[in-house]
Amino acid sequence: MSCTTDKLIQKYDALVRKTTEHKFAKELCAGTLKDRSLYIYLSQDLQFFETSLRLICKTTSLAPTTHALITLAKKIGFFSNDENSYFHDCLELLAPSLTKEERDNFDNKAIPGVDAYINFLDELRKDASITWPSLVTSLWVAEELYWRWARDTPRAPGLHWKYQKWIDLHDGEHFQTWCEFLKAEVDKFPVEEVESIFVKVSQFEFEFFESCYNA
C-alpha cells in the first residue's frame, strides 16, 4: 500500500511536475539562465530564507522525538553556514547585471508571488494552532520539490559555480537523506491531515519560480 507522501505526489503529479520542470530550473541546470534572473531569484530567496529559518526553528521546537529534534537542529546549522554563504557570494558576483536601483528594490521588497509565500510561512510561525504534522509537511514538500529538480533536470557539463553550487546544495546523498527523514515523518499521518498544506506549498513553490523568472 502506498504511503501518504507517495499518494500526494501521485495525486498532484501535474502540480509537482510544473514546478520541478519549470524553465527556471531547466535553464539553471543548462547554464543558460540570465544573471539578472538568477540575481532576482536569489535576492528574493534570501528574504524567504530568513522567514523560513524562523519557521524551521518553530518546527524544531515541536519535534516529537529526540531523533527529529537533533536532525532538524543540525540542519539549521547547515542552512546558516553553507547555504547562507552561497547567497552572499553569488549576489556579489551577479550584481553588475542590474542597476543599483533595481538591486535595492529586489533586495528589500518581496515581489508579487513571493510575498504571498513569505506571508503564508509567517502565519504558520505565528499561529499557535498549527501543529507538527502541518509544519513538517510544509518543510518536506518544499525540500522534496527542490531535490527533484536538482536531481532530475539534465545538466550541462562544466557549469559555472553560480549554477553548480545551487544544484549541489539540493542534490546528493546529504539532501536525499534529509528529504527521506522528512518524508518518513509525514508518512506517520493520513493524507487527509496534510493534503491541504501540501497543495498550498506546492503551488507557492511554482509561483516563486514563475514570479522571479518573469520579473
Swiss-Prot record:
GO cellular component, one term: cytosol
InterPro entries: Haem_Oase-like_multi-hlx, TenA_E, Thiaminase-2/PQQC, Thiamine_Salvage_TenA
Coiled coil: none
Biological process annotations from GO: thiamine metabolic process
Pfam families cross-referenced by the UniProt entry: TENA_THI-4
Domain of life: Eukaryota
CDD domains: TenA_E_Spr0628-like
Remarks, miscellaneous: Present with 195 molecules/cell in log phase SD medium.
Protein family: Belongs to the thiaminase-2 family.
Protein name in UniProt: Protein PET18
Gene name for this UniProt entry: PET18
